[in-house]
């Protein structure tokens, strides 16, 4: 779909003020600064720049784009939007670019007077089934154009165009692309009674789609690095088998082909793709206790990564972009988090507190690990450095009955700024996200279904 969206850089040399007004290092917001002071963002409603006769029937497209951009940048935690009632200009009567270069252009003074750090001016037009979004992002104190781009695509891709622009804004202002073109894969009982199926959705919970229909228990999904494949475990009924088994399947989202890749008797679960997408790390319980194996996408075992000790459970492998492994093991008596190299050597225990530590998740830069830790009768989400130091707690919430809620199954966003997880604080397992320092938390799903083990993809083209 992304190939249908063309991002075209605008020619800004017509306005000499902008051609040389960039920040010297290209970064306007240093990562971490928003924790103490959010930048004030002014974002007037989108202007309709197409034929006036088509404005009314295409208003919904503009509203969808505006709302999506606003939500993305709000969730980023770097911006606070200025209420439109504080605007000093009638933005429906001023152009998207400033005066005097544009005769009816806006005045930077009108925006600096209300304290705006950044200003987004944007317009859109619709011809047939194609929408064009024209955007200008300004740094008000410097009267500088930071980003000018046009985006084109089918009206059905309006949200995706908005997500693309929001990603570009984050890249232009912070130097790091946003996570807004990412997707989430999750197991849920949505619409399936007692069974669980696999679903995908946008990072913000929109566009949810069921991608399995086994009428069974399908769990523990994982994305390939390119977002084109999903591995998951399901208790499918195989022809000729007397019992259902926890088998692993691989779904190719491009072709729709679904392959049974690991069906060894016992557990075949906990998939995590290697950084190059050519292998899967998983837990297999052939023999006695579950151990972690490395497997090709065709199901061929490449090697056994963990080997006991006898009676120990080695589960939930996760692989960093640098190829390091983290997993949960009870080899010391209680389930704790361990790390190892890709071959299973240099094993190190990195958590020592709590009753039960599980579900490790690497940050995209390989510097941090999130996990779920149980202290009393509930789990919470923690983030620590990859060596176990610098641990912080992200979650602490109560249910309506006053008991502590459980927060589980963390997964890092592709930019490393957020952690996604499930929480039963409402009585149902819902999906939430938190900034990596725990200062801001938002609910993603809001329904009466249960969600389990969400996994955040990379940004998907």
Curated annotation (Swiss-Prot):
Keyword Coiled coil: no
One biological process term in Gene Ontology: cell division
Taxonomic superkingdom: Bacteria
Segment forming the signal sequence: 1-21
Stored Pfam families: PD40, TolB_N
InterPro entries reported in the protein's UniProt record: 6-blade_b-propeller_TolB-like, PD40, Tol-Pal_TolB, TolB_N
GO cellular component: periplasmic space
Swiss-Prot/TrEMBL keywords: Cell cycle, Cell division, Periplasm, Signal
Intracellular or extracellular location(s): Periplasm
Family: Belongs to the TolB family.
Subunit structure, interactors included: The Tol-Pal system is composed of five core proteins: the inner membrane proteins TolA, TolQ and TolR, the periplasmic protein TolB and the outer membrane protein Pal. They form a network linking the inner and outer membranes and the peptidoglycan layer.
PANTHER family: PROTEIN TOLB, PROTEIN TOLB HOMOLOG
Function: Part of the Tol-Pal system, which plays a role in outer membrane invagination during cell division and is important for maintaining outer membrane integrity.
Protein name per Swiss-Prot or TrEMBL: Tol-Pal system protein TolB
Species assigned in the record: Bdellovibrio bacteriovorus (strain ATCC 15356 / DSM 50701 / NCIMB 9529 / HD100)
Encoding gene (name): tolB
């Amino acid at each position: 779909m992304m190939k249908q969206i063309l991002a075209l850089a605008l020619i800004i040399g017509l306005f000499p003020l902008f051609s040389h007004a960039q920040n010297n290092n290209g970064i306007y917001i240093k990562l971490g600064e928003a924790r103490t002071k959010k930048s004030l963002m002014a974002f007037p409603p989108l202007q309709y720049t197409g034929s006036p006769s088509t404005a009314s029937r295409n208003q919904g497209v503009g509203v969808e784009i505006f709302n999506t951009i606003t939500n993305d940048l709000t969730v980023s935690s770097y911006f606070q939007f200025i209420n439109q009632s504080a605007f000093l200009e009638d933005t429906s009567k001023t152009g998207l670019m400033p005066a005097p270069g544009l005769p009816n252009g806006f005045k930077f003074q009108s925006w600096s007077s209300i304290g705006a750090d950044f200003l987004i001016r944007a317009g859109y037009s619709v011809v047939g089934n194609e929408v064009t979004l024209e955007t200008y992002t300004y740094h008000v104190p410097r009267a500088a154009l930071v980003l000018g781009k046009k985006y084109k695509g089918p009206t059905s891709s309006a949200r995706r165009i908005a997500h693309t622009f929001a990603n570009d804004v984050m890249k232009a202002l912070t130097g790091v692309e946003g996570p807004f073109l990412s997707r989430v894969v999750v197991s849920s009982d949505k619409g399936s009674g007692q069974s669980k199926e696999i679903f995908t959705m946008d990072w913000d919970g929109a566009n949810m789609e069921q991608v399995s229909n086994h009428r069974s228990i399908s769990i523990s999904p994982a994305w390939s690095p390119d977002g084109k494949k999903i591995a998951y475990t399901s208790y499918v009924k195989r022809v000729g088998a007397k019992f259902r088994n926890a088998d692993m399947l691989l779904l190719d989202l491009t072709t729709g082909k679904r392959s049974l890749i690991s069906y060894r008797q016992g557990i075949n679960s906990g998939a995590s793709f290697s950084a190059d997408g050519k292998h899967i790390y998983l837990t297999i319980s052939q023999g006695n206790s579950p151990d972690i194996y490395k497997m090709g996408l065709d199901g061929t075992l490449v090697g056994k990564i963990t080997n006991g000790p006898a009676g120990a459970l080695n589960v939930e492998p996760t692989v960093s972009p640098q190829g390091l492994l983290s997993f949960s093991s009870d080899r010391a008596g209680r389930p704790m988090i361990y790390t190892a190299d890709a071959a299973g050597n240099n094993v190190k225990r990195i958590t020592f507190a709590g009753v039960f530590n599980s579900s490790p998740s690497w940050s995209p830069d390989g510097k941090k690990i999130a996990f779920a830790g149980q202290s009393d009768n509930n789990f919470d989400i923690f983030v620590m450095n990859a060596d176990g130091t610098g641990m912080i707690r992200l979650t602490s919430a109560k249910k309506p009955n006053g008991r502590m809620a459980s927060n589980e199954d963390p997964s890092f966003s592709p930019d490393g700024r957020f952690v996604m997880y499930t929480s039963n604080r409402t009585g149902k397992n819902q999906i939430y996200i938190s900034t990596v320092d725990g200062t801001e938390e938002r609910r993603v799903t809001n329904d009466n279904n249960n969600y389990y083990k969400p996994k955040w993809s990379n940004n998907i083209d």
